[in-house]
Structures are given as C-alpha cells and as structure tokens.
C-alpha cells in the first residue's frame, strides 16, 4: 500500500500537474493511444485534455465529438480508469489511486476537473450521510392469506362479514426488526441476505418508500440529521430507490429513454454554461459509454412481449436512467440481476466512482456478489429473517464470524460466505469444538450481535456522526443547490428540477415518440375510422331532405358520436402505471404532467382519424352542405370526442385494475348511448334518471349538431300525409296533416326547428351555449384526471405475499396459529424460501439418456435496417448425456439467441446442422427437450403443485400411469424445496410467489416433463442468491449424473459453481465462439488454454469465470487487443472440436435409435382428447379463482340491467313506448361492447403465456387455448346474463307471461351470450395486441350496430347495403328481442303524439278516415268529431314491427340463423389464429405493408 495516495491534497496536486503541456509530453499519458510527440497536429487525446484542463473550457458537444473521435481507444481504457477509481474511501472521504499506474486514460483528472469547475463556479454538489437507528417495519401477515373464488360471490353476505372481521383483526408481522446502519457521504453499503431476509424492505425504508407497510415503520432514519419525514417533503428527489424489475416504455428507444430522464433533471445553472441540448447529449453519452449502450441507441427498449434490447442491456438502461435522476442517496435493489459477471463488476465500479467523486451514498443489495464486487464496498450489513446480524467494515466481517466459530471455505467469495450463514440448511464449515456453540437461528445470531463489541462500536459511531454533522448547514447547501438547479418557473418548495410546463412539454414529446414507435396501433386506428366512415356514409348515402330522412339524419350524427365514444374505451390502459410510479419515485416529473402530456400527444393522431372520418361521412350521407353546418358539426364532434375520451381516461386514473375500469366504463357507455336524447328524448325520461342527460357531454354536443343540421330546413312531407291515396289526393291540403312530429294542420311540410322543439325540446339559441358547456366538461375531466393521477396512491405491494388455495391444509395450519411468535418474521416477499433450500437427498435413478445433441456451423441472421445482421457466426458444439455444458459470454453476446435457435424457437435465416444421434431433429424434439426461460410466466390463479401437475400430464407420454407422473411431481417439489408453498397460488408480481419461488417453479415445470433429450436453461440462477443458485446447480448436477444432457447459460457464477460444469461454450459479441471444451478440475484445462494463448496468469484466489471474461474483453466498456475468436479458429482445441463433432455424427448416425414404448416421434406427447380435458380443467380453475374479473363482470351485468330497466321503466302503450322498447333491446346489445373488452383483457394473458412458453414446448395443441377459453367464459356469462334479464326485462312491464319471458331469456341469455363471447375472442385472436383488438372490436361493433336497422331503417338504406342489413347478426337479435316485446301489444297514443287535422265540411272524422284506415295502420281517437280529428299512426305493436321491417313470425327462423353465426365465430376464431399466429402471416399487417412500400422505394432509388 506504500504506492497508494490517499489524501485529498495529493489528489489535487496530481490534477494540477495534469496540464495540457505535461499531458501531451508525458510518455505514460494515454498509454495505448500512441502518437509521435513531434507531430504538429493534436491527437484526439490532446484535444480532450486541452478542453478539460486548459484555460478555456470547451462546450459539452465539442467534448462529446472529441470523445467519439477517439472512442475506439478511449473505450478500451474505461475499464482501467474504473479500476483506478474503485479504491475505498478513507475516513476523510478521499479516494485512493496508484501513483505508479500507467493507465492511459486519467479519468480521475477528468472527473475531478468537472467537480473543481463546479466548485469554482459556485455550483453546489449535494451530499449527505444516512443514520438508521432501531428501525422496524411491519406488514400484513401473509402466512394466512386465502385466495378468493367465485364461491365467495355465491356466499356474498358471509364473505362481506368475514372481510369486515378480518379487517378489524388483521394480523401483523415483523418484516425487519431493529436494524441499525451508518453510511457517511461517499460510502457504499452492501446489504446481504437471502431472498426473504428483508433486504428489499430495508432499502425501501431507507429510501422513504414506506407507504406499503400496513403495520407502519418505527425507529429513526435521518440524512445528515434531517428527519426522514422532512427529507421526503423537501428533498425527495435526492433519495432514489431503484427496484429489481426493469419497467420501461417498450416502444421507446434507448436514446429516447435516457434523453427524457436527463432532460427532466437538466439544471438551470450548468457547468461552463453549456446549452440544454449539449448537456443532455454529453450526459447521455457518458452513461451510455460507461454501461456499453451506445450501440443500442436506436433500438427499442422492449419488454417480455415486445422485442428490443437484451435483458442485460435493459438492466443497464434501468441503471443509467436511475443515475440520470441525479440523486445523492441511492438504494439499489439487486441491480446486477441479469448482468454477466464482467458487467456486474463494471456496475459496482461505476457506483464506486460516483460515491468517490460526487460523495453520493449508496445502499446496494446483490444476491451473487463476487470477491471483486465485494471489495468495491466500504461496509456490509447482513440480514437474516428480517433481523440484523452484522454491520461494519467489509474487511472486518469475515473475522467477526470467524470469532463466532464459522470458517470461510477455500475459494468461496466473502459475500457468498456471509449469505450462506443465513441458510439453516446450507453447508457450514465450523471450527472444531464450536459445533454446539455457534448461533444457528436468526434469533441466536441477533442476540450474539447485540451483545458484541462491534455492535457497541457501531452505536458509538452513529452517535459521534450525529454530533459531527451540521444539519442546518446541510439544509442550506441542499436549498442553495436546488435553487441553482431549478428552472425559472419551478416553485420554490418543489423538489422537481424543471418547471411543471417543461415537464408537460417533455412528456408530450415522449408521447409522440411512443406513438411513433408503436405504428401498428396508430395505423389500425386511422384505417378503422376511414373504413367505418365509408361504410356508414354509404349506408346513409344522400339521405332524403324530406321528413322521411329526419330520423336518419339524427342517426348519422348519433352514430358519429357513438363511434368515437366506443373508441374512447380503447384508451383505457394500465400497462404503463408501474413506469409512472417509478418515475414519480425518481422525482422526474409530476404524474399529472404525464397525464396532460399523453393527452396532448395523442390529440393530433386522434384528429387525423376523426377528420378523415367526418369529411367522408358528411359528404356521403348528404348532411346540410353549407360551410356553417359543416364546421359547426365538425367542431362539436371534436369537442364531444375529446370530452368522452377524457371521461374514460379519468375513470382509468382512479381505478386500481383494468377490470374495474372496464366495468365502470361499460356503465358510462350505456349512459352515453341512452341519454344522448337520441334513443329516449327528454320528455320521455323518468325523473330519477333524467339528471344523467345533463351531466354527460354527449347530450349538449348532439343538441348543437342537430341544430346545425335542421335549423332553417323545410322538410317536405313524403308519404306521410294523412289521409292520402285514392280520392284523398284530389282534396286540398287543408284537410290533411303531415303525420310527423312538429307538423301543423294544413301544411305539407315540417320546419326543422319545429321538429327539434317538439321531439327533443331543443332550441337553436342553445347551440353556442353548449359549446361553453362542452369546454367545461372537457376541462373538468382533464383536471380530475390530472388530480387523480397526481395523488393516486399505488396499490400496496412491493413485498410478495403468499396466497394459499382456499381450503388448503397449508392455509389452515397457518390460520390456526394465534401466537405472533409462531409467525416467521421474514420479508413477505419470501416467507418460506429459506426453508428447505439446501441440498436435497432425492436421487434421480430413473433418467435414461436418449441421445447426443450436436450443432454444427450454426448461423442465425435477421433483417436489420434494410440489410442483414448476423447474430450467430458458425457456432459448433455438442451435449453428451450425463454432462453439463455452460454457455457464457457478456450481455448481448448471443447466449439466449443460441439457446433459442438450438431449441427451435427462433424465426429467421438459420443455417447449419442440428442433429440428435447424428440424425436431423424430428417433430418430437420440442416436447422431448426442456427449456427454462428467463421470463417466469405462469398462470396466476393456479397453485405451484397444479402448475407442475399440468406440465407433467401434458408433456409426458400418455401411456404412463397418472400416479407415476404425480409421484414424480411430488419428488420435484421436494427436490426444489417447495413443500411449504406447493399449495400457494402463483399470483402476480407483488402478490404471490416472489422472484426465487417463480424461478424454481419455472425450473420445476420443465423438470416434471422429464425431458429425455436435453434440458436448456436460460439464466436459471438470475435473481437468486448464491445459496439458492448453488442448490439449483446441485440439482442440475444430480440430473446430469442420472444421464440428463444439460445446456445452461449463466451470468455470474462463483468459482465453486462454475467448476460444477463439465464443459464451456464461450461467446463474444457477434455470436462468435471464443472457446468450446472441457473446464477441467479446478478449471485447469480452460485456464491453461487462455494462459497459453496470451492471457495473463490467473491468480489462485481469482474466480476463473471472471478471469476468462476479463481476458476476452467482455463487459459493457472493456476491450482487448487480442482477437480471441481468431485465436480459437487457429487453435488445436478448435480442430479437436471439429473432429469430435464429425466423429459423433458418423458414429451415431450408424446406430439404431431407441425409443420408449409408446413414445413415437409425434409433435405432442398426448392425444387431443386428453389435452382438451386437462386444459379445460386448468382454464376453468383459473376462472373460478379470478374473483376480481368475475366481480367486474357481475357488476357490469347487474348495474347495467337495473340501469336499462329503470331508464325505460314501464314503457307503456304509447308510440314513444314502442320506440323505447326497441331502444331498450338495442342498448342491451350495446352492453356487449364493454363485456367483450373484459373478455379480451382476460384472454390476452393466456394467449401470451401460450405463445411465449407453452407453444414452444409443444405442450398441447394451439386450438385448445381458444376453445377452452370460450367454454370457460360461457357459464359465467349465462349466470350473469340471467341477473341482467331479471333486472332489466321485468321493470319494462311489457308482458309477464312465462312463454314470452322464456323466449326472451333464450334469445338474450343463451343465444346472444354464445354469440358475442365468440366474437370478442375471435377479434382478439386475430389482432397483434390488446389495444389493436380494442380498436378492431369498436370498428366491428359500430359496423354491425349501424346495419341492424335501428339508426337507419332498411327502407332508407341504399340498395347496395341492404345485404349488410341481412348479414349483420345484430339485425336478427334486435328483431327477436323487439318482436317478443311488441307482438300483439295494443298502442294508445298520448295526446302530444296524435296528429290533428280537420275533415271536409259535413263529415265526421270516422267517416272521412274510413277508406284510408282500411288500407293503412292506425286509428282515429275521436271518430264522431267534426273537427280536430286525432290520428294515431299505429294501432298495435305489430304495425311498428312492420315499419322496422320485422315480423314476429321471423322468431324461429332467426333462432336458426343465430346458430350459424355462433359456429362461424368459433370456426373463424380458430382459423384467424392459425393464419396470423401459427403460420404468422404478416402480409395483412399495416406496418408490414408500409415497410414493404419503403423497401420498394429504396430499391427504385
């Protein structure tokens, strides 16, 4: 250590000596970036040095350009600069640096110059230490949670009573207990513990994320003396919690994601007064260079379902985004998950740099920390079942436990050793004589710690630090620094950096980027609007200007409003809410700013569709073709569309789940449909619901649009003069009346204003008053949405609570435990993970090797930016039964790509040979191999045991006894240590199994299939601690010893774990092989290869896995001069591998293959009928336990039924009553829209699970996903439609006789449910994603509703479209429902519905009308009168049926037609899924069409 400088003065002197002249002259400066000292021109290194250390500072853009110019050399030096800065801070906070180092890129001087510049220019850098004293946190006791089912609804009163009782007597449990810590500014604290130890909870408490702890948090957390409550109120932006999961907007690129985060934190006062643009670019390039993301700038971030960057790169994006938040205190929760060993080390070094130079404070949990990573930290704390068992300097931890009696095994990393102590079933090396003295349980460890001198010293250090810090000074620095950073219009007390309107601007810009990134949704939206406008416009083509077209004109305008109301349903989305919560935690922007920004960004795209829609519809339908009318209707349609869209978005902002939002939106949709005043006019509304029309924007828009259309219009009476025909035509019009609303005796026309006043109570002077009202609605909804979004608290979560199957023994056992002492005091995210995690004594003696898997010269190429990109480059290898092959390489090297290619899961240009026993793979390959994916995707409502049982039944041969399969499942449960939670529901992330338990389940699902060829595993230890990882690898070793072939990618193996593998395939970026061959005992074989080919000698204390990754230049920023791929191609080992591969092919191809009896080379292991049985059971079970989904469905039907029933209560016998009966049936059908949205939201999860995991393993036939989903939906729809029938039909008070009621029930509750469930699923299964399905569904519904004869009578339809009236299934449902209600129903017109006229002198009304009534419908109310004859147009309900082109006699004909549509939906559902997802035909995709057009243009150019 004599050559290490540790004082601040020496560091400053070193920087001062780094002038541009000495830098250029020094032979040691920028080693590896060689140049002739006599050259006249400056090298890039010289330029950069002058910029940073010369008297005149250059701008960030010039620096960035210069770094780019020298990038090939500079990047190769970043790792060495990280090493230099990865020394420990001393008590004084200075960093250490080797003075003899010949590192070329003097990063310390560069970073120090920035810090010095900030100091010279008076720019403060915030920093604070953290003191944690006796902190405890309580949560709901998750050990006795029971999953709810549909049975809870059937016993609703008892369920409500139990819920109230449970709420009052809610059991709490200790999550963390009496934790203490001290982190001075500039220190890094490593938090160790197994999953479930409370590490995540400790970090959340430290970061102030305490809302989720139902039992509250006690103790004291302070930041340089500032209490946590005050810190969260005034300086929340400085405390950052970075969660374990990577949630991002998938359609944004990496560059856009980072730019946005940096822009939100761009200070007003910047070093050297660089511009905002330059600041953002330089920061982004800095983070991207450190984490190796520059090559991904233009790649989408993606997620589990949207292709983007790799999982490791996505994790690095998360880290860079968190750093962009510019916190002074960071809490990193398992931030190295998914990173390879080299990149994980670089991450730790990067955090070390930030703490050294910026004096930030970091708390980090890492489940698999290598010795190199461990040594970058200052202090370490160890948690065991929520209890703290050590806190202190890292080099004192091992001696502390050695004094206790525990010894660290040779070559075991210190972090691994410390974590292993908290595993009661793990292997522990104990000093002789201490076997009965060492602590074993969490309580014993805690007692030892509390009585230790180390604990007493820690308490003294905390007390001394609290005395030392100047809290007021810290506040002053924070206030001054934040004032310097805040932009001009940011509130003084706000902890956000940029002003609110700047946040809105940035969120709007990001909204445009998101929409552009997801082109398919936008294209589908606009195209559907254009298609619908052509169809509807042609349906109402040249609507007559006479009275016969008045109702149709209203129908055109109503349809336009209804269509964009339905489109508003598609805007309900919850997938981005976790991202919003994360960014809120980072203090990037107000959630309300995103609410406004997303609205503003989507508005232009909505306007494009709406404008195209309206222009086509307006001119085709023949509306009032004046400029005033055109622009007025367009304006009000736009205002109403935006207002209703705001209404639905407001609803989604206040709801917790998608099902809740869909249910409420469904009720609102019915209200919008009914109370627009088109279906039921104001005079006909009942007083208890009439107020609804006044609180919805559509009523005001519809009034103004009708006024614009009918004001000043003279409508001739067409075919409605009464009486007419025969001798009546010779009489004067003085003896006739126009049988139309608003008519006057003796007039052959009706004024538009009179029609509106009498029919709707509308007056023209309200037109522009309504404009103001609509503005109020629009602004009101937006304001409410903004408020709800800003202050909406997330659903309490973060700690995964286990939920047991109802009635399970495990649940009953825990529920009976009264004493709190019996409750495991461990983190809710893993209550039972620490139990039974050690090595299990189960033996696999029944695995028999079935073949050798060989791949030779495998290449994989994909289209990329108009060209091709090779992801795998002539990779060869083999897997022999009884061996384990590790697949390693840095993130993005192609490990997962190779695994997917070998497992037949990639689609692209694949060349090379993949053989089993020397022969090409057959149809049974996928099901005879197991594949454990990185993504842990499962059915949330199944238990662990049920998930395993289903996999075993589907993937093992059918001829095997079921008892044998189930016994093997139980064996796997024991081997994986899952007995304690085998009856627990899988659940969702945050409420169910935790990361480790999900990973074990993913492995178990493949193991129970007992693959007899090969087991692929993609990062099986990702997210697990070292002990769980060891247990998993030991399990794989047992499988290999029993004859299993295993190929496994692995990121961060310890030395002991790495040496468990027999063979290694090492890849570098570009999918190029660097090594394939044996590892050897103590890694001797592979180390010999690398040392012999030019790598430095590996020290005996080093981890061989990290050593070889370092040697080949793996990592985000590392680089080496040697071309290890070229060395491999020229090596003896490569020739031996080629020979071995060819020998295996030659020898094995001559042998006869052995196959298990009954195990034919078929695609599936079981028959279709067998699959159908168990897939249906699984899907039905999932539905039965989905209480939230079922409750949402029930509320939609129940409330919807009551709503319709009491809106049209007692329709009566009047003319309006006839219309109301028809509209009641029409609205009942419209209710299917939100119901289908619910169906699609539910079904998409099962589709994604099948496509991502189950289809890849050939578990069962793809059609069963569709069919079982359909069959499982039906019982609930039949049940809840019965509730709807009772609550809607009988309040109408039409006919109560059983025959009519039964027929109505048959049509609506059975036939209609069978129809629309299939329709909703069919549309979903043809769509690329859920939002697109919602749009297409809206298009189809509006299409069918338009042609069912309600809004436009068939008599007025153009001849071309009458076939669509016949083709629309809703036509026949409306005919039957209305026919049942109106058949033989007598009509008695109300006084205002009668048409009055005078007969000729000397005639009574009856005598005068007798000839007319013999041919026409209706009746005279006063036949003996001689004046003011009162005529009613209908006499019986069947007259009205005839008017709408329907007859009661069509009832059973239509019933047969229903079956045709039902079967068509089912067949079409299967066919479209096969076309678009099995065959993956993409030629119909709008984006594919656009891309093909672009490619054609490029070729022409």
Swiss-Prot record:
Protein name: Protein SNQ2
GO CC aspect terms: cell periphery; mitochondrion; plasma membrane
Positions where N-acetylserine occurs in the chain: 2
ABC transporter domain location: 161-410, 853-1095
Residues where Phosphothreonine is found: 1153
InterPro entries in UniProt: AAA+_ATPase (IPR003593), ABC2_TM (IPR013525), ABC_trans_N (IPR029481), ABC_transporter-like_ATP-bd (IPR003439), ABC_transporter-like_CS (IPR017871), ABCG_dom (IPR043926), ABCG_PDR_1 (IPR034001), ABCG_PDR_2 (IPR034003)
Note in the entry: Present with 1300 molecules/cell in log phase SD medium.
Regions of compositional bias (Low complexity) in chain numbering: 18-30
